[in-house]
Design a protein with these regions (language model features):
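Glycine-rich phosphate-binding loops of nucleotide-dependent enzymes
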Residues: 1-238
């Protein structure tokens, strides 16, 4: 579904992404982990089009999107939910989701967009809050709204950037179940996360980054015992 080949991005003297190669298969939940500053968010920004790479190629559904703007990637089926939720606070949950359903699709009939919102609001459990102003939501409800708004763009691949940050353990478990339902609805998921219990519970496959490079990938239990991964998180033993 998604193929990344030799992707590099430099900020001054810092190589934030260093010849990254990565594949995401349709139907999987892929986690990208690594210590702070490993290049995870840079990678997500390159995939979603918020940054342009200095080198390398990105293909999505068999087509090159390396130079495509973010909105073109959204129209093609790349959705993204952000760690910092920024809804329209004076608008209701329903209205926020309708914005997502209509984004970049001016010719979409309103009734079609409303059907999309209805499906997503049921999937994400936000129906009881449909007419609530977004500014009145709890943190967990805000996170659900962010996921739901991304889903309203009808993505084939959903990028999640630490969407569980700040949640209590019980809330994180609810969010894990929601992401599973999203995958079961036919959406492939690539997510960045620091909470290892969440990664272990969700990921079919884990990619580990450090200093802009992929240093390991595979099932969680395999990468968790990889010496390079332990060194990245804990430092080299003296």
């Amino acid at each position: 579904m998604l193929s990344i080949q030799g992707l590099s991005k430099r900020f001054g003297g810092v190589l934030a992404a260093n010849s990254v190669n990565l594949r995401v298969e349709a139907g999987e939940i892929l986690a990208v982990i690594g210590p702070n500053g490993a290049g995870k968010s840079t990678l997500l920004n390159l995939i979603s089009g918020l940054l342009r790479p200095d080198e390398g190629r990105i293909e999505f559904l068999g087509e090159a999107i390396t130079q495509a703007p973010p909105e073109a990637r959204t129209w093609k089926g790349l959705g993204r939910a952000f760690q910092i939720v920024q809804p329209f606070p004076e608008m209701t949950v329903w209205e926020n989701l309708l914005v997502g359903a209509l984004y970049g699709k001016p010719n979409t009939p309103l009734k079609v967009a409303e059907r999309v919102v209805e499906e997503v609001i049921q999937l994400t459990g936000l129906a009881p809050k449909a007419q609530t102003s977004a500014g009145e939501l709890t943190l967990l409800e805000d996170k659900r709204l962010e996921l739901a708004r991304a889903l309203c763009t009808r993505p084939k691949l959903l990028l999640l950037d630490e969407v569980m940050a700040g949640l209590r353990p019980s809330e994180a478990l609810e969010a894990v179940e929601l992401v599973r339902r999203i995958r079961d609805s036919g959406v492939t998921v690539l997510f960045i996360e620091h909470l290892m219990p969440v990664v272990r519970a969700l990921a079919d496959r884990v990619v580990v980054m450090d200093y802009g490079q992929v240093i390991a990938e595979g099932p969680y239990d395999l990468v968790a015992t990889n010496p390079k991964v332990r060194e990245a998180y804990l430092g080299r033993a003296s």
